[in-house]
């Protein structure tokens, strides 16, 4: 008779890692095993595995048939039917497989990213220069034109390749008086599926008087069951000029992915001279994704963008921007709130939204004096 010890070796990680059970036998004749029906088996594996811990009717609980997961020497996993003389009342044996099924998956306690990037720019006789810079992995800040040339564009890089649940990323950009800078990202940011904790992204922008700051990152792609909590805090001073953009893409269209669950929280807080002039919060919870096709919500639009502008001649530039939006094929609207131009754009595909945003920057940029307010170079890479 073949005797099976209880758990001989186990390696389990709660996120889909393997759980290996090794079989130990005290019987030298491994090829001949007696089943409870009295028939003989030649070590063949049963292709219809039974539940571990279930017993056949009419047999003693100490001699019922079990199915044991075996990791063989050739590293192939098979199901083996055999007699087990184990005491099924032993909690150390029966509780362990149940724990693996009953215990919910969690990403708590796993290693998470804690990135930070701070950039301060000032104005000199040769143009904008770097006053201070700080980086903490996985956040990097690069410049397309290094050396003694004036800084025109800064590129935020996430070397981790994406954002997972529990990650924290912070970015701070300060334009001192007279500085002019455009900040973008190297590629689209990806937010992966999260089990428990959301990914937290915090962006802080500060534009002092006579400075010009453009915040134009590429899209953020939300994977199915991703959890994102993002805040964008902007502090403006009289005489400054700012153009800021954030856009979200729900799912990967090339994969045919449809986001059916998750959590998204995207909020803006804009202050002028220390006073709050605009606050906005966009949230989608698990139960909301099933209703995004409604016209009152996203009306089947999987790509959405928010664009804000602060500067002089707001009324004139509002009308100019409205004419641009009317010529676009995606759904767009613009308004003036608290001394701030706010535009919304939505499209079914991210490619359509990107074309619309490029068109806005190409036409609206020269109207407000170009400089940093143009299509970033990284958008064409």
Which residues are covered by each model-predicted region?
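Residue-identity detector for glycine
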Residues: 16, 38, 43, 53, ...
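N-terminal, charged/glycine-rich beta-strand/loop interface patches
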Residues: 79-219, 224, 231
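Acidic (Asp/Glu-rich), glycine- and aromatic
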Residues: 223-231, 236-263
